Amino acid sequence: VMMIYPEGILYCQVQPSDVPEIVEETLLKGRQIKRLAYEEPTQHKALPFYHDIPFYGKQVRIALRNCGLIDPESIDEYIAHDGYAALGKVLTSMTPEDVLREMKDSGLRGRGGAGFLTGLKWEFARRSQNFPKYAICNADEGDPGAFMDRSILEGDPHSLMEGMIIAGYAMGAGQGYVYCRAEYPLAIQRLKTAIAQAHEYGLLGENILESGFSFDLKVKEGAGAFVCGEETALMNSIEGKRGEPRPRPPFPAVAGLWNKPSNFNNVKSYAMTPQIILRGAAWFKAIGPEKSPGTAIFALTGKINNTGL
């Protein structure tokens, strides 16, 4: 499959021998090659643009909004697509309470399975008077055939980071950890590149955007144990202990990493956060079902017609 931007032309079953024709006809002359276009199975009509294909027609990209569109190793391209605009809004015109209210009003629920309200989790951590506090991203994607988190980490790491910085501001945390399985070397490399770029631009570290708020991020590589996808086992792993679940209560929002208040969200929840802040809770709530607004990402694998996200 080949996608050509900015036109959004989708070619299927592309072979190396087709490349010269694609360069000559589509890239240089702006012509579509109908024999490579997707064919609608009932009417056998060629649909060269991906947004005309019924499979994609109703999809709304929020967490995946930049994947495939920008260079994931370029902070400048992320900024050119409204990157870090939400963080700027938060640090210049919103209090932590404003952020918590917006997130709760949006109705965003955890995309990891439990479906707990994201804003409420942040509020629990905010209420705790114990310091320091930690914002943690669970990127230990261990389910067979699942590659939703990996696609975001590899394709748009700055969206995850921006969401985590906003979460840190809302809950009063100064340090964040991204726990990523070692089987995702490209994701880890791009995360580390993005962190270095954010430091260089003053978007991570001390006194971000001269706001008085400081926050930093570290990447922790997991050793591949499936159980470390459970948040308390994940905390033990970060602390250098055996990755075994802890009894609850106390819950992580009260006594989490190193027995300090900690907030856990998955990659998808953090990646959606900047768009919620930028566009507003009402915009997000208008998408999807009433009790669980927004979008969800599904990995489709196996013996089916359309594999992917």
Where are these predicted regions, by residue range?
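Feature of Fe-S/electron-transfer and energy-metabolism proteins
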Residues: V1-L309
